[in-house]
């Protein structure tokens, strides 16, 4: 029997998703918990790997098992053995043809950024941070150059193992959540607010979103014009782009599957993001 799980996690304490000899990864913790519940070794395959410090709202994994249990028994039983910063949100039996990675038609990420003269405190590690005001129109114009199919070599980490740097970005949305009028505590021309950058594409390269974010923020701060984004893209060189941005505010929102699989499309964790 093949099972699919939706998993959410705070990535601050882990060395990314993928299993490592240290054992301090989300995959290692999940498989250990599944093994204890199932009393047998369980190997999972995920929809998309995340780096150290990156969070997951709805990672999807699949695995094969001989254990017959109700779907919610998998949820409660596995969560019993998981640390508090990792939780299985749902479980569902799927056909043997389902593959969490190969069946995904797209993947979604969000980056949450705090704009404030004061560094984050209660949300430290869960948001990125800038202390300069950002130009929304400039950032919006800049990301238009990235939509569609392109060679994203300029935004690719040197350790990336992808066979091709050509990917397709379907959507990049930028939204700003500001405090109510009259309640701003901004200083030095920087009004505190949260920015949310949402990305949807067929697939992503290693560090691709964090490298794009570095360029978006540089343009938002006025260091470069919006057209610089196209210059960086066409250079096809990592040296042409801005430094890699912090992993703190990056969230893997999850994969997108066809309706024929009947899998959940979101979890409650989506609703608390700014």
Swiss-Prot record:
Residue ranges the record marks as coiled coil: none
GO MF annotation: an example: RNA binding
Transmembrane residue ranges: none
InterPro entries listed in its UniProt record: PsdUridine_synth_cat_dom_sf, PsdUridine_synth_TruA, PsdUridine_synth_TruA_a/b_dom, PsdUridine_synth_TruA_C, TruA/RsuA/RluB/E/F_N
Binding site for substrate: 109
Reaction(s) catalysed (UniProt annotation): uridine(38/39/40) in tRNA = pseudouridine(38/39/40) in tRNA
Keyword RNA-binding set for record: no
Alphabetized Gene3D superfamilies for the sequence: Pseudouridine synthase I, catalytic domain, C-terminal subdomain, Pseudouridine synthase I, catalytic domain, N-terminal subdomain
Source species, domain of life: Bacteria
Active-site residues from the entry: 51 (nucleophile)
Entry's EC annotation: 5.4.99.12
Entry-linked SUPFAM superfamilies: Pseudouridine synthase
GO annotation, biological process: tRNA pseudouridine synthesis
Key words of the record: Isomerase, tRNA processing
Pfam families documented for this protein: PseudoU_synth_1
Known partners and oligomeric status: Homodimer.
Similarity comment: Belongs to the tRNA pseudouridine synthase TruA family.
Classification via NCBIfam families: hisT_truA
Function text: Formation of pseudouridine at positions 38, 39 and 40 in the anticodon stem and loop of transfer RNAs.
Protein name: tRNA pseudouridine synthase A
The species this protein was found in: Acidovorax ebreus (strain TPSY) (Diaphorobacter sp. (strain TPSY))
Lineage: Bacteria, Pseudomonadati, Pseudomonadota, Betaproteobacteria, Burkholderiales
């Amino acid at each position: 029997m093949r099972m699919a799980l939706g998993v959410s996690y705070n990535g601050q304490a882990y060395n990314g998703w993928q299993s490592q000899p240290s054992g301090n990864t989300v995959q290692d913790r999940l498989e250990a918990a599944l093994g204890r519940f199932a009393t047998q070794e369980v190997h999972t395959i995920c929809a998309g790997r995340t780096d150290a410090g990156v969070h997951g709202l709805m990672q999807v994994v699949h695995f094969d098992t001989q254990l017959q249990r109700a779907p919610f028994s998998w949820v409660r039983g596995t969560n019993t053995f998981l640390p508090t910063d990792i939780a299985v949100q749902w479980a569902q039996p799927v056909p043997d043809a389902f593959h969490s990675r190969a069946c995904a038609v797209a993947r979604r990420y969000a980056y949450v950024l705090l704009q404030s003269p004061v560094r984050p405190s209660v949300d430290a590690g869960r948001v990125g941070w800038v202390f300069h005001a950002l130009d929304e129109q400039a950032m919006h114009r800049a990301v238009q150059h990235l939509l569609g199919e392109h060679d994203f070599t300029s935004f690719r980490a040197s350790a990336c193992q992808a066979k091709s740097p050509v990917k397709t970005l379907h959507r990049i949305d930028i939204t700003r959540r500001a405090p109510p009028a009259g309640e701003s505590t901004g200083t030095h021309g920087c009004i505190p607010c949260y920015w949310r950058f949402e990305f949807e594409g067929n697939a992503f390269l290693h560090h691709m979103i964090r490298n794009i974010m570095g360029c978006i923020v540089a343009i938002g701060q006025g260091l470069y014009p919006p057209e610089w984004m196209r210059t960086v893209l066409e250079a096809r060189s990592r040296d042409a782009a801005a430094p890699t941005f912090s992993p703190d505010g990056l969230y893997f929102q999850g994969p997108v599957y066809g309706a024929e699989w009947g899998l959940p499309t979101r979890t409650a964790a989506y609703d608390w993001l700014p």
